[in-house]
Structures are given as structure tokens and as C-alpha cells.
């Protein structure tokens, strides 16, 4: 059953009595998939999801990063992690299961809208994955939010239809709120697309929670001073898919010359680069070493003006026969095999943290941010 804060009323498919949603098709007990879709008045064919909460972004950071992830993007990544979900509680702490076109919840009011595709993915695959529970929360800018749960009814012998439970929150649903932190303690795995503008807070929270997680982000988030140490210590790494992803964007977004399109339905789309998945769940890809063939020579691999390390502009050209520290593009993180290379630092501003070694400059010319790596077979001398 679904707890809700609405006045008692009667509808064709369900009864709202004493603030309880009772579904007619399930003997006034459980909300089924299709009644749930009608209850939310959502367009189930819509292939989008909010990549970070727009209200939170716009009201707290002043940034415009309201994007909607395609369901196919979620499916392409999560198919590699199915073994992790059996019997687990999954928490999507930046996902609204029913968000209207104007950005506000239209739970049962007939206003139309669409649903979070992270919620949608786990709703559609709840029994296939063998989930124990799904919890979703999201931020509301000007009013209390709610949590929505799908709860397994399996008794070990017979598979039952899951219950759908909607419960008002006292607070706004911010992932840092006491209510959401308590839900984080309850869960086993977090899967979501968090607010990109708050990744300096979000990723450390996930890592220090001790929970497993799989979240969308940008590769450059790894080089934030608040986050980099966790990549260096192999407490987080990149998932399977990365690169340029298309996201649906609101109508008020301005058209751009590149990485922008409008489809046949008039929907605007933006393509974002360096998008990736961050996770602490071990995957086979992570242990596949790079196939390298280049050998070191000082002409092809110049030393930085600012630090005793060499520049390598392409991950495929990392030399195989040097013990020196090598500066490589951030895209290396998508190919990092911890048995092959250790991450020793980063070359960015030279002052962001103890691991920010120097500004990457070669022959007086600055390079883009680099990850500092070294072969794992490096033998330290007595002077090091």
C-alpha cells in the first residue's frame, strides 16, 4: 500500500482512504505496475531522467545543469552489475518517480509528466534482479518532499507482487538531510545521477558511507581535490561506459552550434563529453591491462618544466620501459588497471592538495590536467 498526504477521495482504479492508496486491481492492497503508471499520469514511453535535480542546482548553485538520462544509458551500464543486486536494498537519492513538465510532482493530479528512468529501470527489473527494496528520494525547492519505495513480498517459497509505498518526508529531500542520510544507512547500494554541481560533496559522502554505489558523473570530477584521493587509494574507479552521452534538456535551454539537436517531436537534446560512471563495485574490465608497445625516449616524452615527470598525451602511447612518473590524460582513469599502474598524484594547479604535484608545463606551454601514474613494477631506491 502507498502512504500519501491527500484528502480522502475515490477514483476508478484506486481508493484513497485515511491517507492510504488502495489499488482495486490488487484487492485494494497493492499497486500494480500499470495502475502505478496511471496513478503517476506519466508517459511511460518517455526515455529520459533528470541527471541531477534541477531545482537544487538552480536554487543553490545558480548553475544550469538540468539534463535527463536516457533509459538505454542506464541499461547499457547496469547489465554488467546484475549479480550485485539480489536480495539488496537499492537507494536512488536524487530521483523523482513522478515529476511533471513544470518540474513539480504531479502524483495523481492528472497533470501529466514523466518519471525518473533510474526508478523506471528498477521498477521494470525489480523481480528479475531479486531486489529486496527500492527507495527513491529527490529534492523539492519550496516544499516537503517524499520517499517512494517498492518492497518485495517474496516469502522464500512463492514470488509475490511487490508493494508500492509513498511516504511524505518532513524535509526537502536533499541527499544531505537527516532523513536521507538515515535512508542511506538502510540501503546496500546507491544508484543514481547526482547533481553534478555538488559532486565535491556527493562522492565523498558515498565513499565514506561504506555503501556500494554506481553513479553518473564527469571524468573531471575525479580530479577535484575533495575526490582525487579516493581514486588514488583505489576506493572508487570508473565503470564500463564513458564518453559523449546525449541528454534530453528542457525547452528553455538555448540552442548551440555543436552537440545540440532537436528531434522530430521538437524535443531538445544536448551531448555532453567525458561522462562516465563512478563505482566501488568490482568489475572485470578494471583488471584488464592496457596493451602497450612504445618505449621511452626523451624526445617523444619530454620532462615537465615544473616536476621530474614525463608528458604522455595519449594513453595508448604510455612507454612500457620507464620507472619515471608519467603524466597522462584524465581519460586514463577509464582504462586504469591497478595491477598495472599506480596513481601517484595529479598535475593541475600544483596547490589544490598534497597530491596535486605541479602545473603541467612543457617547454613553457601549459598542458591540460593530467593524472600522474607509475608502473607497478617500479622498484624504489633507498633515496626515495
Please tell me what each predicted stretch does:
Residues 4, 9, 13, 21-23, ...:
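Class I S-adenosyl-L-methionine-dependent methyltransferase catalytic core
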Amino acid at each position: 500500500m502507498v502512504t500519501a498526504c491527500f484528502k480522502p477521495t475515490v477514483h476508478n482504479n484506486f481508493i484513497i482512504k485515511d491517507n492510504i492508496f488502495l489499488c482495486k486491481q490488487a484487492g485494494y492492497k497493492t499497486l500494480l505496475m500499470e495502475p502505478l503508471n496511471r496513478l503517476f499520469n506519466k508517459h511511460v514511453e518517455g526515455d529520459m531522467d533528470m541527471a541531477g535535480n534541477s531545482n537544487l542546482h538552480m536554487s543553490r548553485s545558480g548553475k544550469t545543469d538540468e539534463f535527463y538520462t536516457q533509459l538505454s544509458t542506464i541499461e547499457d551500464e547496469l547489465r554488467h552489475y546484475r549479480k550485485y543486486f539480489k536480495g539488496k536494498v537499492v537507494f536512488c537519492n536524487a530521483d523523482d518517480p513522478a515529476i511533471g513538465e513544470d518540474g513539480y510532482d504531479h502524483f495523481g493530479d492528472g497533470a501529466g509528466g514523466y518519471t525518473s528512468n533510474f526508478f523506471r529501470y528498477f521498477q521494470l527489473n525489480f523481480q528479475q534482479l531479486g531486489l529486496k527494496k527500492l527507495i527513491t528520494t529527490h529534492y523539492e525547492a519550496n516544499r516537503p518532499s517524499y520517499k517512494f519505495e517498492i518492497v518485495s513480498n517474496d516469502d522464500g517459497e512463492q514470488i509475490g507482487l511487490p508493494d508500492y509505498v509513498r511516504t511524505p518526508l518532513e524535509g526537502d529531500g536533499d541527499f544531505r538531510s537527516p532523513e536521507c542520510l538515515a535512508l542511506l544507512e538502510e540501503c546496500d547500494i546507491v544508484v543514481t545521477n547526482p547533481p553534478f554541481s555538488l559532486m565535491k560533496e556527493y562522492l565523498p559522502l558515498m565513499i565514506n558511507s561504506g555503501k556500494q554505489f554506481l553513479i553518473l558523473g564527469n571524468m573531471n570530477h575525479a580530479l577535484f581535490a575533495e575526490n582525487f584521493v579516493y581514486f588514488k587509494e583505489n576506493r572508487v574507479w570508473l565503470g564500463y561506459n564513458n564518453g559523449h552521452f546525449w541528454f534530453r534538456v528542457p525547452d528553455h535551454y538555448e540552442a548551440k552550434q555543436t552537440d545540440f539537436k532537436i528531434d522530430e517531436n521538437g524535443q531538445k537534446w544536448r551531448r555532453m563529453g567525458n561522462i562516465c560512471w563512478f563505482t566501488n563495485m568490482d568489475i572485470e574490465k578494471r583488471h584488464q591491462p592496457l596493451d602497450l608497445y612504445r618505449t621511452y625516449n626523451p624526445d617523444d616524452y619530454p620532462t615537465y618544466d615544473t616536476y621530474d615527470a614525463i608528458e604522455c598525451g595519449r594513453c595508448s602511447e604510455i612507454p612500457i620501459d620507464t620507472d619515471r612518473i608519467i603524466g597522462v590524460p584524465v581519460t586514463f582513469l577509464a582504462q586504469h588497471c591497478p595491477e598495472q599502474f599506480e596513481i601517484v598524484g595529479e598535475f593541475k594547479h600544483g596547490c589544490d592538495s598534497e597530491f596535486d604535484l605541479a602545473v603541467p608545463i612543457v617547454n613553457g606551454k601549459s598542458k591540460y590536467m593530467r593524472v600522474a601514474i607509475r608502473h607497478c613494477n617500479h622498484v624504489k631506491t633507498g633515496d626515495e
